[in-house]
Amino acid sequence: MLGAMRRIGEDPLAFLAGQWRRHGDVVQFPIPSPPTYMVSHPDDVRTVLVGRSRDVTKDTLQYRALSRVTGQGLLTSDNPVWREHRRILQPAFHPDTLPRVAEHTDRAAARLVAQLSALDDGAVVDIDARVMTLALEVVGDSLFGHQLGPVADRLAEATLTALGEVVALARMPLRAPGWIPTPGNRRMRHALTELDAAVTAILAQRGAQGPSEPADMLDMLLASGLDRTAVRDEIVTFLVAGHETVASALTWALILLGKHPHIADRVAAEAAEVLPGPGDEPVIDLPTLARLRTTRAVVDEAMRLHPPAWLITRRTTADMEFQGAHVPAGSLVIISPWIVHRHPTVWTDPEEFRPERFLTGEGVGGAGVRTAYIPFGAGPRMCIGRDFAYAEAVLALASLCRAVRLSPSGPPVRALPLVTIRPDRPALMRVTHR
């Protein structure tokens, strides 16, 4: 048992993939309490997340660790809190809100393009840090009507610090209590102070300016009757998870395009044809976004190979059966989209970067295999911000590719499984102007 836990901590992706290759689609780990299983076949994934979603909860170490940062927000809570908060927040993610997301993304992308355009040809940037800031700015503007401005970089750093401590807690739960001033606890407290200061600033600005028009997510939270702690938890949840997922998808898309410049050129050509030009009225509506088909396919393929949420866990509240294996109530069930997205019964040449597979329907063609692609989860707990994230990622990627070519510089990055899949070092890329 100790050996298995050590290997999980050292390289979780390699360990889980090795167990899957060795034992198949249902793996029972030598962990007695709770009984722990990993399921990887899309049909079993569908059972857990869709068909029997009422028989599982998020009462797992993964989500308890994350709640140190987000509290009982939408990402970590269970019923009845989750159902009530989802009802309150759902209107903020109606398709009618996507043009506003596109508008804010267009502005944030234009700022980043201007920064890159001011550099000399051949300059090297950490593209991961740049898109982290972009994604935070879009969340702040779109959901809270708050321009984060110069604090966005600080918030991005605080988010990475807090999530790093979450991962450490999830992998080594027998740590010193939070009140003991260990280095890790001090880092966590400092990060939470930064995040809570952002919440205070967002609420103070809304108090001074009054409701947004049209209403945004912050208005809905403040009108809901939720107490200050619940409002704080949802703001932090969306500041953290709302930008981390998009930033991860964008970073890996740009890294992969840097290795496949001919595909980057196709994205740039599509963007030049579809997006408004520099002198045009910057109106980006849903039909415009829908025309960015190649760009969307690149985002999809980047999230297939590097799913932002690489690990999904659930606690069973009833007995289940997968591929003939009995899983008792009270078990921990692990799903790794990293593995599911490579399942050979669905994906051809699963390790290859082939965005065109999403233009032909491979892997997502029918109801029986929709759970073969789960970058945002599936079923009732599917990410509420899925369409928001797609609009932002697709538009930002198109805007960047139209303006610059980005090619790898320095040692290649590897996937580092933290709360999301991150590069294991700065994602250094060389800028060439188009």
Residue ranges and their predicted role:
Residues 1, 102-106, 157-161, 211-219, ...:
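Cytochrome P450 I-helix active-site segment
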Residues 1, 57-63, 81-83, 97-248, ...:
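Cytochrome P450 heme-thiolate monooxygenase catalytic core
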Residues 335-364:
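Conserved cytochrome P450 K-helix/beta-meander segment immediately N-terminal to the heme-binding cysteine loop
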